[in-house]
C-alpha cells in the first residue's frame, strides 16, 4: 500500500526542503539545488544528511522558523509532526494488503511512499534500520531504510516469537497504524485522510 501520488509529492516537498536547508546550514556537502522526484539526491548523501536531521530536533525547529517560507501550511505541519517519530531497528514481519507490519517494542502498520515496501523487501522477516513518521492518519518512513551489512536469517523459534508478538498486539488492539499528527497534540486527529493506492515506481524518494 502506498500514499496517493498527491500525498507522496507533499511529503517529498517537505522532506527535500528540510534536507537541503540542513545541508546548507551544516555544510555536510557542497550546496545543491533542492531535489525533486525526477532529480533526487544520491542515497548515500541523503542518508548522511538525514542522520544529522534526526539527531537534532532543534534543526527542524530552526527550519520551520527560518527556512520554510516557501512551503505551505500542510508541508509545515508535516515537518512539525516529525517530533513524534519512532526510530531504530525494526523487523519487517510481513506485508499485508493495507500495510507492512514493522515490529519493535510495539507493532506498526506502515505504508510505502513511492514504492511498495513489499517490492523493496520481498523476503521477510527482515531487519531494517528505519525512521517511522506520521502522515496524517497513517504511518510512513522517511524513505531511507537501511538493512544490516550481513545476511541474517530467522529460525523457526524466532519466527514463532515474532508472530506471537504480532498476534498479541492485534488481540489487544495495540497494532499502531497512526502516530500523533499535529505537533502540539498527544492524540492526533488528521485534517483529512490520504487516499492510499497501490502502484509501482522508484525504490525510494531521494
Task: Give each language-model segment a name.
Residues 104-105, 143:
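Residue-level recognition of conserved beta-strand positions in structured domain cores
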Amino acid at each position: 500500500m502506498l500514499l496517493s501520488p498527491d500525498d507522496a509529492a507533499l511529503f517529498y516537498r517537505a522532506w527535500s526542503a528540510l534536507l537541503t536547508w540542513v545541508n546548507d546550514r551544516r555544510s555536510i556537502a557542497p550546496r545543491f539545488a533542492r531535489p525533486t522526484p525526477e532529480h533526487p539526491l544520491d542515497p548515500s548523501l541523503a542518508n548522511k544528511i538525514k542522520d544529522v536531521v534526526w539527531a537534532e530536533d532543534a534543526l527542524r525547529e530552526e527550519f520551520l522558523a527560518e527556512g520554510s517560507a516557501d512551503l505551505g501550511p500542510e508541508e509545515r505541519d508535516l515537518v512539525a509532526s516529525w517530533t513524534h517519530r519512532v526510530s531504530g531497528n525494526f523487523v519487517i514481519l510481513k506485508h499485508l494488503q493495507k500495510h507492512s507490519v514493522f515490529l519493535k517494542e510495539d507493532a506498526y502498520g506502515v505504508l510505502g511512499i513511492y514504492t511498495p515496501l513489499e517490492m523493496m523487501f520481498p523476503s521477510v522477516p527482515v531487519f531494517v534500520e528505519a525512521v517511522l513518521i506520521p502522515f496524517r492518519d497513517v504511518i510512513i518512513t522517511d524513505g531511507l531504510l537501511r538493512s544490516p551489512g550481513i545476511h541474517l536469517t530467522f529460525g523457526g523459534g524466532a519466527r514463532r516469537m515474532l508472530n506471537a508478538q504480532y498476534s498479541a498486539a492485534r488481540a489487544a488492539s495495540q497494532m499502531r497504524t497512526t502516530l500523533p499528527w499535529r505537533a502540539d497534540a498527544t492524540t492526533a486527529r488528521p485534517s483529512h485522510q490520504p487516499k492510499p493506492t497501490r502502484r509501482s515506481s522508484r525504490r525510494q524518494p531521494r
